Amino acid sequence: MEQASATTTVDVLIVGGGIGGLTLAGICKKLGITYKVLERSAEITPVGAGISLAPNCLRILEQLGHLDFIRRKGQPLRKIQIFRNSTPWSLVDYDWVQEKFGYSVYSIERHSMHQVLYQGAGPEHVLLDAEVVDIEDVPTAPSVQVRLADGRQLAGQLVVGADGIRSATRRILAATQGLEGANTIRFTGRTHMTGYTHPLQHLGPADLGVATWVFYDDSILTSWPCIDNRQWFVGVKSSELKNPTRSSWKNATQAIINDVYGDRFHPFGEHHRVRDVVNLAERVTASDVFEETTFPAMACGRVALVGDSAHSMTSFIGQGACQAIEDAGELANALHAYFASQSPSPQMLRERLEEYRHRREARARYVFSFSSLFAQLHTGRLWSPMGPLLRWVAFVCAPMWCWHRALTPLYGYQPVVHALVDAPHAN
């Protein structure tokens, strides 16, 4: 990794080397905008299990040249089989998504997708072990100053916070505006236990692309199809908050997950048990799930936010990464308009970021509300005590046009980076 000097100056400083930050970095690279990604971790290691990439983010990833990789290493969703305990409820067709929106919904290993974005951004532009502790945006100054925990100083024409649900950028930004310097997230009362498996050798071609939702009496478990009949499973159960300062558990194991789900029914288990799937996991994780309570301004002065740093939401509709990618694309349009100007100025930059803010905030609120509503429906808590009945009506009785109508605003919105529309789609 490149080491920053005390006077490092670039166009854009991106705080956070996750999906959103690296996507923005890759776009900046193609647009000729200089950038530096500041990642607090000391190394890039496998984290998480799977990731969902839906049509609303795939046009941007195609512009970056990543669609061929996604098609090779990801699995398009074809069907969803739904069970109540071990009783079949319905089989939902999902092939229509490709036909209607031009892209399927893909499940792919998170780490492999992260590595592709990392290489696309350029490791030489990523500073590891770079924890941001202060951001100074003085309106009359020519640049925004960033200070790291080890004392290094960096400067950029703007700073982008892409540092996740417990965003340091957001806390610093709030404090500079005289607001409480804390993220406004709340615990949802749910713990997610997830894993990504080796191929399930007993499954066949007919099982490829088939997702599974199982509604148990006291919890739920979904599994998403990945390449070669691998499974990305997500168990959801009610729980007490273990640590208010972090989301991920430090020591998640297969045994912990099997204690909760092991003896439960799963149609893809070799013996129709969840443990048959969990025991084939390459890695597992567990996390307490938080979501946003108050939406911050997605830009203030010369500082902007993308992804979970601005609008963390539940993962039930698989839109966390998709929304971060949408943000990155829309922000890149604002940045290109600024840097391509004949007479750029700090005031013009603030105006471009304000336009970005207004474009993205309404969309983020819509997707957040959709995700929250779907989570309540999925867990049988929507309009409680009517929740279980409403869930049955939605997933057993509702005709396909209901799915089309619900998902069209979500998947039909497909932003692009305007300056890359005619560019060849290659890394």
Swiss-Prot record:
Top-rank lineage group of the source organism: Eukaryota
Cofactor requirements of the protein: FAD
Pfam families in the cross-refs: FAD_binding_3
Transmembrane segments: none
Record EC number: 1.-.-.-
Residues that hold FAD according to the record: 39, 110, 308, 321
A GO MF term: monooxygenase activity
Keywords, ordered alphabetically: FAD, Flavoprotein, Monooxygenase, Oxidoreductase
Described purpose of this protein according to its UniProt entry: The subsequent chain release by Dieckmann condensation (DKC) could be catalyzed by the TE domain present at the C-terminus of pyvA and/or the alpha/beta hydrolase pyvD, installing the tetramic acid moiety.
PANTHER family for this protein: MONOOXYGENASE, PUTATIVE (AFU_ORTHOLOGUE AFUA_6G14510)-RELATED
Protein name: FAD-dependent monooxygenase pyvC
Higher taxonomy: Eukaryota, Fungi, Dikarya, Ascomycota, Pezizomycotina
